[in-house]
Amino acid sequence: MSEMMIVAVTGGKGGTGKSTLSANLFFYFIENYKTALIDCDVETPNLPYLTGCEDLFLAREVFIEVPNIEEGKTYNYNNVCKEGALLKVGDKLIFIEDLCSGCKACGINSNITFKKKSIGKIYEKKFDNGYLIVGKSNLGERKTAKIVTETKKYGLSKNCEINIVDTAAGTHCNVVRALINADKVLIVTEPTPFGVSDAKRIIKVVEKLNIPYKIVLNRYGISDLKIGYNFKIPYDKRIVECYCKGESFLKYNDLRNYIEEIANWIIWG
């Protein structure tokens, strides 16, 4: 294992159990390794609940810079906004703040000035041998890319031996941002038609990024659907009970074995 291992846990669709896997891997690793659990699902972070840690403290706020358009002022706008956040109507420049990503391209060769806008926050919880780092977008915020980037950056700044990055579901840009620079990827799926279909999509993304990956079949046993996998986690009532309580299921030795098998691949390959 390298000095700093980054493993991303992802899945093509929501609800497959990737965050449950991330949380239990975290509790397994902190027994012997300094570990960071980084929640990059910034629009719907749920690792605080799955780890029983709702008492996080605010580590930092995430800002972007947006145009400061003043009423009655004339601007020599360069018409480069790909998001459509700036519209020229006659001599008037209209700014639609919700569409702005903060790229500041509109300020090139222009008299447009900028102001800070808060788009989200990063929260932290310290454990004896690790950290839970959680990015969370402000309510209604549409442009959340920088929150993902800053959350991951802040988590990695803790210099932990193991870094578990929990991504959002899907194959969109924020998922890619969370996956970039990972040493290994765990793709979590389930034996359902949607699970198989969406797993194929995220596999293509991970292969494009050229990152080694393994497939974890969660809820093994709920159907006879055939799907290739490397590791499995069975459908078990005890896992559901632990999930609802925000607890790890590692206390059950037979279930712990499934996590240990995955952890061994992360550490030893």
Curated annotation (Swiss-Prot):
InterPro entries: CobQ/CobB/MinD/ParA_Nub-bd_dom (IPR002586), P-loop_NTPase (IPR027417). Pfam families: CbiA. Keywords: ATP-binding, Nucleotide-binding. ATP binds at residues 12-19, 130-137. Gene3D superfamilies: P-loop containing nucleotide triphosphate hydrolases. The keyword Nucleotide-binding applies. PANTHER family: 4FE-4S CLUSTER CONTAINING PARA FAMILY ATPASE PROTEIN. This is Uncharacterized protein MJ0579. It comes from Methanocaldococcus jannaschii (strain ATCC 43067 / DSM 2661 / JAL-1 / JCM 10045 / NBRC 100440) (Methanococcus jannaschii). The lineage of its organism: Archaea, Methanobacteriati, Methanobacteriota, Methanomada group, Methanococci.
